[in-house]
Amino acid sequence: YLYDHACERKGGEKALKALLPKTKSKAHLKKLGSDRYLAEFTRKIFQSGFVWRVVDKKWPQFEEVFWEFDVERLLMMPDDMLERKAKDPAIIRNFSKVKTVRENAMMIDDTERREQQSFGECVAAWPNDDMIGLWLYLKKHGSRLGGNTGPFALRTLGVDTFLLTQDVEGFLRSHDIVDSGITSQRALKAAQTYFNDLREQSG
């Protein structure tokens, strides 16, 4: 029913499929370097509340300014260099967002040290029936990865996670699956349970 509803909302099955990001295998997610996770987190942070195409157009410059998101190199970046990068006209000059690059590099490094495996392996090992657990981990330990920012980044990277878009939230509310704030623990658990049931039903 949800799939039929989505097709109707988006103008047919073909149009819907064109909008859906391709999910990747666990093997792919394991091999994906920590630099790519950090890059996508950063991209989504800058796209949040901003014109996406402007970020996309400047993205090659972001890669250059932040050393292709080399985590180890970014960890050693001193404060004065971070401030200079935040003023670089080649990127979008927003210091509070630029700071997240080093902060999320620290989160990735801390995760790898604690778990004794790569960040990609940690993401790939996360249970599919607890995606909200991964969302909450990123929100708690990362910087500006709450709301839909972290989940959108994961989905773009190929993680098989649902997203609480306005359409999805509207559907969940209209079917009395969610009746509280969408970011509340209660709502997240209800949404996760619903999508787990859908996964089981679809095989």
List where the protein language model places each region.
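N-terminal polyanion-binding entry modules of DNA glycosylases/AP lyases
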Residues: 1-94, 98
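Short, amphipathic alpha-helical segments that act as regulatory/interfacial helices
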Residues: 42, 46, 59-63, 102-109, ...
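Short helix-capping/linker segments at secondary-structure and domain boundaries
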Residues: 48-54, 108-116, 177-178
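Short acidic/histidine-centered micro-motifs embedded in hydrophobic/aromatic stretches
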Residues: 58-61, 77, 104, 156, ...
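C-terminal accessory module of base-excision DNA glycosylases/AP lyases that mediates lesion recognition
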Residues: 1-22, 116, 120-203
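Alpha-helical ds-nucleic-acid-binding substructure associated with the helix-hairpin-helix region
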Residues: 67-144
